[in-house]
Amino acid sequence: MSEKSSRKERDEKTEKETARQGKHRRIRVKSRHYEMPFSRGVLARSLTAIGVEPHKAYEIALKIKEELQDEGIEEISTDELADIIRTKLEEIDETLAERYELWRRIKKREEPIIVLIGGASGVGTSTIASEVGHRLGITNVIGTDAIREVMRRVLAEELYPTLYESSYTAWKRLRYEPAEDPVITGFLDHSEPVVVGIEGVVNRSINEGIHVIVEGVHIVPRLIKKEILNYPNVFVFMLAVEDEEAHKWRFYARSRDTKLSRPAERYLKYFEEIRRIHDFLVEDAEEHDIPVINNEHIDETVDQIVSYISSKLLKGERELSKSVSWW
């Protein structure tokens, strides 16, 4: 073997060894505040949060890692990495890329985002809240029914009898003859102590910087303090189901799918009262300039809520937040 051939063989081995070492070299991700190793798991989880299927999220994460290693990159900033991720998502679906940008903006914020989703029984507040939380990467989702249970433990039934009824039967426990619609009067009396608990959750979230979504029938605009409704980081929505027959059908579907302790018949027995509360909440929301969304299709409702929040964040981002870097 000639000296020239030997040199060529050594060079090829060196290149292969260098490439092999590059494949196993750790990539560091840096921001102004921290440095950490690149993690496919962390990246994949951030992608699933915006709706990418888990297997696809890991494929994208692996591909990005391999490309960085092939280019011999040992250090990359979070912003540079985010640009690469967005480009990959744009190749798949522009909507996913937009969701990723929104998710990043929310994660950057030091000030929390609080979403309140109201609506009468059966309009789908819990389903929509869960989907919005998944889309925005907000894991804290609280139902007002849970807050009501806490308030029941704090406030005696003798003092607040309507609190111990359902929102649509509270009128039965009124201690006086109401001048107006007893169903609405009872509902408001029932909701007042729950709203105190809702305001407590919102104030704590603001003070501690915790993103949260609160959903349920007790989100009554006229009962919530104006400073909370007007707080720039609080987003309030009211859900409706305009078609009464569609609203009725939802109780049957929910009872069948979730094995509720209360069968559909109980809700349908008081359907007239539920619809009166439904219409009252819609009117109250409109009077307070709160978006009312006809919840016919889950995806469309979620898109409307997320788009509204996104546009508001973009409009007031400079005034509302100080950014730190996240993936």
Curated annotation (Swiss-Prot):
Belongs to the 2-phosphoglycerate kinase family. It catalyses: (2R)-2-phosphoglycerate + ATP = (2R)-2,3-bisphosphoglycerate + ADP + H(+). Residues 25-111 form the ATP-cone domain. Signal peptide: none annotated. Its EC number is 2.7.2.16. It comes from Methanopyrus kandleri (strain AV19 / DSM 6324 / JCM 9639 / NBRC 100938). Residues 1-20 have a biased composition (Basic and acidic residues). Its cofactor is a divalent metal cation. Catalyzes the phosphorylation of 2-phosphoglycerate to 2,3-diphosphoglycerate. Involved in the biosynthesis of cyclic 2,3-bisphosphoglycerate, a thermoprotectant. Pfam families: ATP-cone (PF03477). It comes from the Archaea. Keywords: ATP-binding, Kinase, Nucleotide-binding, Transferase. Pathway: Thermoadapter biosynthesis; cyclic 2,3-diphosphoglycerate biosynthesis; cyclic 2,3-diphosphoglycerate from 2-phospho-D-glycerate: step 1/2. This is 2-phosphoglycerate kinase. SUPFAM superfamilies: P-loop containing nucleoside triphosphate hydrolases. GO terms for molecular function: ATP binding; kinase activity; phosphotransferase activity, carboxyl group as acceptor.
